[in-house]
Structures are given as structure tokens and as C-alpha cells.
Amino acid sequence: MRMTSSLNEGGTAVFRPSDKELVFYLDSGGKAMKTYLVKQKFRLGGERFDIKDDRGNVDYQVEGSFFQIPKSFTIYDAQGQTVSQISKIFLTFLPRFEIKLSDGTSFYIRKKLTFFRDKYECDNLGLRIEGNIWDLNFKLLDDRDQVVAEITKELFHLTSTYQVSVYDEAYSDLVISLCVAIDYVEMLESSS
């Protein structure tokens, strides 16, 4: 017999016998969370790579266009449904990227005009970013100042590897799309 756990409205973990396997990971504040490990695998040709959870299960697949200008990426969930489309907007003075989510919403990453260090901003994201977005070490907060996700870059890897912890699963698709877009922009900037 297996035990399952869930959180009741007060945030207390409730355990009950079940024939199905259900696993919740809790952060120190008692919130349910999902953790993903993302390894950068961008190349200039067509690419396809998986984003796995902390148990090694494939939750998302990223597929890049082949010989398409401007290059675009499509993110699929584990069932093969489109989660988002990432594309570079052509014919702009400074680089700008659009991320369209499957629910019809979209947000943008755009380069700001600066003289010393590259700076980017996210427009229409609906979340506040705290930390350094380009070093992949930041938190995303909602309008009530609740942390909905945390992204941290892991050191000592041959490729860019980062951990994505999502505390509110309703934001999973948006957070994964944002991270893939940031990684893509970072790859383009380092190759230019």
C-alpha cells in the first residue's frame, strides 16, 4: 500500500493510503513545489532537447526551427501539447524576443540601450523579477510578493545548467518558457 500526501487549505500536509503514486515536494515554507533541471543545448542548426524534473521524468521538450529566419523555438509538454513559441522579432533596432504562451498571452524580452553591460527587460510578464536574470540567479514574485519560482545556475558544468523550482504550478509553463528564452538570448549574445 502506498501513502499519498496533499496540502489542505491551511497548508498542512495530509497523508492517506492510495493505489496511485502522488509525490509532493515541500519547500521550507510548506509550499508544494516542482523542480526542473535545464541543460543548455542550443546550436545554430535545428535542435531538440528535454527538460526533466528532479526525478528524471521528461516534463517538457524544446524544439528549434531548422534554417528558419528568424529562428524560433517551440516548447511542448509531456503529452506533446504546445506550451509556448519563442521567436526573435525581426527588423528592430535592438534585439527583441516574443514568447507566446498556449493560453494566448505573450510577453517580451528586449535589449536596452546601454554603454557598458548588456541589459534586458521583460515586458508584459505579469511577475516581478528579483535578482540577476542574466546570471540565471533570480526569483519571480506575484503581485502579492509571494515567490512563485526560483531559478539558480549550477556551477561546475560543461554546459549552462540551471535548476528551476516552481512553487505555484500554475506558473510552470510561463517560468519554463522564460528560462528557455533567456538561455536562447544568452547563447545568441555570446556567439555575436
Q: Where are the model-predicted features located?
A:
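Intrinsically disordered, low-complexity segments enriched in serine/proline and basic residues
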Residues: 4-8, 15-22
